């Protein structure tokens, strides 16, 4: 089976104190354009199923894909980002550009986060043998699963682009192989 792990589109910034409770931002205008470009790109692929993080930025990213492909979206709590309880959301690219050290923060209890992600993704793999499945999630989730496949400890070893696709093949023997990381050809014209 083939997994397409897709990072959500660009969300809005939410500063601490701007909302009651955890920050769960909607997509920005650019994010909606990215999500539409992704849906156009995936229309040329044969996708059999759609899975998604329950977080708003992921759900809004997958919505045009589901509409275009006429597929139902399944939510999986184990695909939520490690910052799901944060009181603010600042896009990591903004943090990095500003020299803010938070851009490279790893999740609290990275081993636990990785276990949750791997269990969720492997559950999707088990449910879809022989199929191509698109999974809209988060940069931390993609890093955690890719690091698991590669056998590395670094919980955040690369920065997936918004709506980028990382392809992983999952054999019925349990073997996993990464075909690509961070495909973003669908964003060329944005």
Model regions: which residues?
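Short glycine/proline- and acidic residue-enriched helix-loop micro-motifs
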Residues: 94-112
